[in-house]
Every structure is written in structure tokens, then in C-alpha cells.
Amino acid sequence: MQEPSPKNKKGLYRLRRADPHERLSVRLRHFSFGAAVVFVVAAAGIVIHSLYNIQIKNGATFRQYAAQQQLLDSTIQATRGEIYDTSGITLASTSVVWTIWADPSYSTALFTSSKNDDTGEVTRTADPAALQEVSTQITLRLLSGDGESLDSVDTSSAAYQTQYQAVYDALSKSDSAYQTLATKVNNAIKLSIEQYVTAYNKAHKKADADKGIRKGRISVSSTKSFQRDYPYGAFAAAVLGFCDADGYGTYGLEKSYESTLAGVNGRTITLRNAYGNAIADENATTYAAKDGSNLVLSLDVNIQEVAERYLNEAISANNVENRGAAIVMNVKTGAILAMASKPDFDPNNALDYTANEAYLNELVHAEPELYGIYLKNEDGSYVTDTNGNKVLDPEGDYSGYYRDIQWKNKTITELYYPGSVFKVITAAMGVDSGKATINTTLNCSGAYGVAKETYHCAGKKAHGVQNLAEALRNSCNIYFIQLGQRIGSSLFYDYFDAFGFTERTGVDLPSETNFMQYYSKSRLGEVELASSAFGQAMAVTPLQVCTAISAAVNGGYLVTPHVVDKITDQNGNVIEEVGANVRRQVISESASKAIRQIMEYEVADGTQGGGGRAYVAGYRIGGKSGTSEQLNMDRRSDGDYKKVASFVAVLPADDPEILVYVMLDDPNNAKTDYSSILAAPVVGNIISEIAPYLGIATDGTDRSGTTVKVPNLIGNEWSNAQVSLNIKGLKHQLAESDASQAGAVVTYQYPRAGAEVPYGTTVYLYTDTYEGRHTEVPDVTGKSADFARQMLAAAGLNCIVAGDANGLVQEQSEAAGASVQRGTLVTITCG
């Protein structure tokens, strides 16, 4: 074997002498380098993958997150539109209110604090004196009404004690950062509380240098919100509806026109700091709110007030069990001038039913099946007593029923049998179809058989031979059954459908019932036709009746009723105007003229017929009464069917402009159920006030300068007394202090019976035992005759103008300041 060269020997020698640890270190360095390369590559991959996910795959999402953290997006609340009556009087508006709240955890002045030097723990103990002082001052301001009249607050009242305790308890919660002290606070009170808090903090500010705990501060703040206000309270409530706590329309016009009234909220987008607060930034982006539009109604507050007043009186006087309704509408355009359902509610506090609770409780218990208030077993069967009678639930919560009932607009949500009012429609069918004329005579023998049924007129009276006008005045069931037979089932149904009874009226209000109760053409047999002809076989809504009667007298046109007349912007500019919407012509003009004639014959001059009690001297009025049995309801305790008394009138009868309708659901008058006695006077009373107000054409008779002898009304029920005055052309006023209770009779009147007074004089009626009320005569000298008349009327006095009516008052027959009886005639001499 050849030996290595010297050079190779040297290399071999060196290799053999290498340190084993050095060889390991080399290998480790190689491995570490490789691992580092792998780690760097992997990390780079992870970073690249993350960047891909963040920047590309989920870039939009993360950019959105970043924007949310960096930007503050604030809502600009749109102002809800207002609701006005036809003359611009505000019925619903929105006001700024404030929620007053406190941060007790930051209100160090209300607590005594101590710090444990070892643990650093701070213990807070309520300071009763401070809490009492602050709670008292805040409560006084909350109840002052204006933030200033603190001395006027009765600190001994229950209201004060309740509010004080609520504030005290809220401020006592030392660990809470948010406690509500009051809601719906007006701006004056809010400013007063802010001023008090600022002054308090300034006066009590100090620091505990030793403990390092700041003392002497209370933290009270406010949050802006909006409140819906209804200045007239329980007035046209079923029409207006109300808004919920969040400001959304829940019922009535507030609901049906929600999108119109609400407007569109705006936004402000700006940068915010680390604490989430907005940074002043000239580059902030603002999207202005679009305020809601206003509704201008066809409703007239003066007509609505008259309708509600007389409806309330009638409900009380006749012990009406299931509420009442009234409608005044323009027969040519469908514009609703008044719509009332009573009792109703105050939309400012729609959840409250306490004012009507007793009435509502009786109503619910009168229809236990309808409201499901019987006790039930676990299997769903009813609990019964030993006699097998169902047992009422003594602990039932009926509040939901109470609210639902008082919220309902009775004119569109509830069905009833119209009874004899429907005879107007049957007459229109007969005349238009050529099956009858005004002079068509038919015989009423007192009983009439159809199949196996025998029909009678009221009181089983035989009216004998009569024409159409006489039959309507006599409200003869047998005449109209025979007329229905002449018309026939098929044609009768076609007219019934054309008059709108098989569909909604289309009124611009929510919750109009979609449930119609009538016989289809195929099921309208001879008995069903007979009952339908006089209004006892179909259930309809009051508004359906009004639109159908309007069509019968306005030339034959079925119009869509509406409450909203126009929509305006916040500056009053008209955005949309609602005109008459004629759906179709149902009968001819000539047939409509005939219906107007027979309806006027029903009322005549107030001396004959069931409609005479709706007569008002000086006006041509057509009308029809209807006393119907409610076959779809539980019977009364005496076994008789519950009744509805209704009356509809149109005027002037020769060319009607308005319709007035009143219905009383289940009246319990001790003397009668007849609508001619119960409902007709209510309609007449409404007409007596609104006809002059609307300028309705009179009958053309010049009564200026004529006098009327005042009738003796003492001993008459007040409603009958009013009828007597309407017929004679005298106005009437029920004394304010007198409640129109059932059976109330007139105990005093002024002017007295037998007095000769000018046509149109107001007679004051009293139903208590106090003989006469006095009033102070105002000084009207120097005033115009019209203004003087208004001043005297406001004082409860009648007026006679002597001399030049265009001049100023020179003398007055009763001295200014004198105390005289209300109703006294004061002669003013003008020149």
C-alpha cells in the first residue's frame, strides 16, 4: 500500500484530530439554518395567507369593522307630521320631550366613601341627608309643570310622595350607571333640573386630598325623545288612533297613514375618539331627515263636538249597553265631517281604561260567550254549577278586552242588523227596477205568511192599503216583504251588491271589517228574501249603511267615504288632494229623486211618522228610523233579543248635502226600544246645531221678526223637551251641571212657558231642583251687533237687535254687571 504524500498526510492528520463536539456543532448549525429557513418561509406563508384573508378574501368585512370603530353613525330623527281638522285646528302633533336619568355610580355627593388602605377597596354608604335634599328638589321641579312654580307643588299629595320615592330609590342605587328618574318631561322642567344640578355641583365641589376620592358631585342627564300629543284628549279618538311607545302608528289614521306621517330619518357620519365620542370634523357627512307630511282632514271639530256631545247624552240617558256611534258625511263626495264611537279613550294614554272600566266590565259580562270569560276544565270543557250553568271566571283578567273594545271604531269594525233603515234601500231597488213607484199600493193585513214563516209589523198592527211613501212612514214590514217579492231574489241580490254591502267601503281607516254577513244569490230563498227586504237578514257596518243611503239620495252614485281631505308638507304646500271617488252609479237620478221625496215624507213637519222627532223647524229633512233585533247576539235576561236603535237623516231633502246617522247598540230605556223615540231626537239635535253652522239651505220660509210661544217643558224627559223646541224653531241648552241620566226630567226652564220669544231663541233646560241659574250681563255697548250677540250668547243670554243692525250698540236693556237668569232676552239698540 502506497503511503500518502506529505500533503495528504497533513490533511489526514488534521481530520483525525478534529474535536467530536465541533463536528456536532457544525451539524447543528446546518440544521438550525435549515430550520430557520423553513420557519421564515412558513411564517411568510402564514403572513401572506393572513394578508390574503384580510385584504382580499375578507377585506370588505374588515374595512367595515374598521369604519365602525373609527366612525360614529348618528340618527337624525324625522319629525312626525301633524293632523289637522278641515279648518287647520291641530288634532295631533309631535313635541320634544326628555327622559331625565341619573348615574348614581358617579354621583359621589350622595354617598359617603371610605378606602381600605391595605386592599384599596372603596366602600360607599348612602348619605340620607344628601339623597333627601336632591330627591326633593328634583321632584319639585318634575311636578311644577314649568320648572319654576315649586311653591305650588303639594308635597303632601299622593302624586308627590310617589314621584319622590321613585327618584329617591333610583338615586340610591350606588352601583348603577343608569337610572331613569322621569320620562316625557318638557323642556322647561328639563332646563330647570339642569340648572339645579349645575348649581349644586358648583357649590359642593371639593376633593378629599388624603383619600384621593372626588366628592361633591351628582350626575343627572337627559335624553331627547318625541311625544305624540292629542290636545283634545278623548275626541275623535277612534278616527285619530294613537302611537305606541316607539312612535309608530298603532290604530286609526296614525296607523293607516304611518308611512306618510313618519317621514324618513336622517344620518350624520363623523369620526369618533377612543371613548366613542364624536370628534368635531368639518368633513362630517350629514344626510338630512325628511320630516313627515301632514294630514288635513274633512273632519270638522265643531261638528265632531256636537255629534259626540249628543251621542254621549243619549248613551247615558238610555242606558246603552254596547256603545253608540254617529256619522256626519257629505253625501256627494263621501267626505266625513264627524265620526264618533262612544265611550272611547284618550289617545294621550291609550292603555288606560279606568274611566270606562265599570261600563266595559258590564259589556264584557253581558256577552260571556263572545269574550270567553267562562271557567274551563283542563280538557277544555266548561266548568258548570249544580244546575248545569257555566261558571264565570272570578279572577279573569279582562283588561285586554277592555282596551280592544274602547279602541274599536264601531262604525267600521262591528256588524249589526240595520232593520227598517234598510227599507230605504229596498224602496230604491223597487223604484229603479220599475217594480214600484211612489204611488204603488199594497195591502198590510197585520200578518203575512212566507213559506212556513209568518211576519208581522211592529205591534202586529194592520196598516191596510198604503203607497210606498206611506209604507215607509209607517215602517210597514209586510209592504216591503211584498215589494221584495216583486223585485225577486236575483235582482235583489244584484242591487244589494251594487249598493256596496258585499265589500268594504274603502274608507281610509284601518281595521274595516272584511267579514260580511249576508245570503249569497244562490242561498237567497223566499224566507231569506222576505227578511232581507226589511233589514233583518244581513249584518252590515254603520258606514256601509251611510254610503248606501248617500247613493240612494245623491243621484244614485256610490262614493268612497274618506276622512283625509289632503296631504301637505311641513310648509303647508299641498302634496296630494283627495276628491270624490265615484265607484259606480247604482240607481237613476229619477229613482233617487223619488227616494228623497219619500224620506222627506217620513220626517215631514215633525207632527207625523217615526221620523218626526228628527225635524228641525226651517229645514227640509228626509229620514228613516230603524229598530232591529240582533239575532247574532246573546239574548237579554228577559229572553228578548237585544235591539239596535238607529236613525239616518239627509238634508236639505230636495238636494241633500249632508247625512246624519246615529245608532245606539242595545239601549235599555225603561219605556221603549223604538228608534223613533231614542235615536231620531239625537239626529234632530245634531242637525239643529250643525245645519246653521254649515249654512245648509232652509225651507225658504222667512221667519225673521216672528215670535214663538215657549211650550211648557217641565215634567218632560229632557230629550222630549228638546224635540219640542226643535219643532218650534227654538234652540235648547241643557245646563252644564246637569247630567243626562236615564229618566231625567225637566224641572225648570227659562224662558218660562208661555213667553213670546223671537224665532231661534235658546231655552235653557234644567233637570235638577235648583230653580234658575244666573249669569252676569256683559257690557256690549260700542260693539258691533254680531259681536255683541256672540258675547251675550257666551254669557248664556238671548239677544234682540233693534235699530240699525249694521251700527254699533248704543244701549242694552239689561245693565252691564247685572245678575240675570240664563236665557234672559237682552235687547240691544244699534245705531
What are these regions, as identified by a protein language model?
Residues 76-79, 86, 93-97, 176, ...:
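Extracytoplasmic
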Residues 1-391, 415, 490-497, 616-617, ...:
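Periplasmic/cell-envelope proteins involved in peptidoglycan metabolism and beta-lactam response
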Residues 150-170, 320-333, 443-445, 510-513, ...:
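Acidic/histidine-enriched alpha-helical segments
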Residues 92, 98, 273-287, 332-421, ...:
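Beta-lactam-recognizing serine transpeptidase/beta-lactamase-like catalytic domain environment
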Residues 78, 125-133, 183-187, 247-251, ...:
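Soluble non-cytosolic domains of exported or imported proteins
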Residues 578, 618, 632, 662-831:
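Ligand-recognition elements built from short beta-strands and adjacent flexible loops
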Residues 139-148, 198, 244, 262, ...:
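Sec-exported extracytoplasmic/periplasmic mature domains
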